[in-house]
Amino acid sequence: INFLTTPSIEFASMKNWEGTVGELLDYMFDPTMTWEDLKWIRKQWDGTLTVKGIQNLDDAKMAAKLGADAILLSNHGGRQLDRAPVMLHLLSDIKKEFKKDYEIHIDTGIMHGADVLAAVALGAQYTYVGRAYLYGLMAGGQDGVERALEIMRTQMVRNMKLLGVNSLDELTPKHVRFLNRQ
């Protein structure tokens, strides 16, 4: 890849934006949103409602109380909020407070098949793998994405064998150990 003498990479989603990516993010995220807005959205939308960006137990409880069908634990990849709670640590605390069938998703820190297994073992019904997907996309387009996902699948299968489990349903919190949780 020749970044020095070829034109800069352009993102289709940024063609009409004059500022930087950081300025676009500042523009897109609305700091005036409140729980009242979630109440309004719930009244307007009768479909499944998942609230993204949950970073503590109180917010998880509030989202559920206001009618969210699911919560998505996220520090938005940790790039902007690199001092936010570790979502896998938060997951185990939140799962203790919610019914078994309440949907909990996690999208931060999933970079290896073992991360998927840890999230499932701690109670997540869904994990999101944006970073691996994007790295694969940047490196090799669709083939790169398929390869990245295949690597994660292989890691999951290998780690399940090492843990002595045959299905995701067999995973429990006893299969997860945290390093230096404070």
Which stretches of residues belong to each language-model region?
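Short, well-ordered secondary-structure micro-motifs
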Residues: K61-A64, D82-A84, V116-A118, A139
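Alpha/beta catalytic cores of nucleotide-metabolism and tRNA/nucleoside-modifying enzymes
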Residues: H89-D107, M111-Q182
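Conserved, mostly hydrophobic/aromatic
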Residues: I41, A63, I71, A119, ...
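Glycine-enriched alpha-helix->loop->beta-strand junction motifs that scaffold or abut catalytic
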Residues: Q44-T48, A64-G78, F98-D101, G123-T127
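Glycine-rich, proline-tolerant flexible connector loops at the mouths of alpha/beta enzymes
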Residues: N75-P85, L134-L137
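Generic beta-strand/beta-sheet core signal
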Residues: K52-I54, L73-H76, D107, V129-G130
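Active-site entrance/lid segments in N-terminal catalytic domains of soluble metabolic enzymes
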Residues: I1-K61, K65, G77-Q80, H89-S92
